[in-house]
Amino acid sequence: SYLTLSASEGSNALTVRWDIALRDLDYVLQLDRDGDAKLTWGEVRQRADDITRYATRHLALASGGAPCPLQATAPLQLDRHSDGTYAALALSARCPQLAQAVTVTYSLLFDVDPSHRGLVQWVAPGGTDAQALVFGTDSAEQSLRLQPPSWAETLRQYIWEGVWHIW
């Protein structure tokens, strides 16, 4: 899945865009109701609430030890990526306060596919460059700093993730 998180200066809200492959959602939620091995917009739309519930049960955000509850901000949409069609969820998380970092706990599909990875882009308040992170079973909880990373930190992270990916 592809998860984009961003925060704005002066706000306690986080903006969340989460694209999840329909093939993965079909595997766990059995979206293909007629069994023809082809998902239609109607089949996906009928299960939009189930998709949102499933996704938000597998993503937790917190800041300063307090949870930041997720809620949908727009109806489910579809988006095409190079490897297929994705459900695109528009969410927001309102935190009681944004402390120095946001703790993200990601567990989507880990119970059925331990090799699943979540690719995350994080844009800190006042930042223009996104920080890239990868969530996996061994890195399911990560801390996102509210200060934008330096160019050196960003480069180090890309090199680390690249080496880990090749390994």
Language-model segments: residues:
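N-terminal soluble domains immediately following signal/targeting peptides that reside
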Residues: 1-164
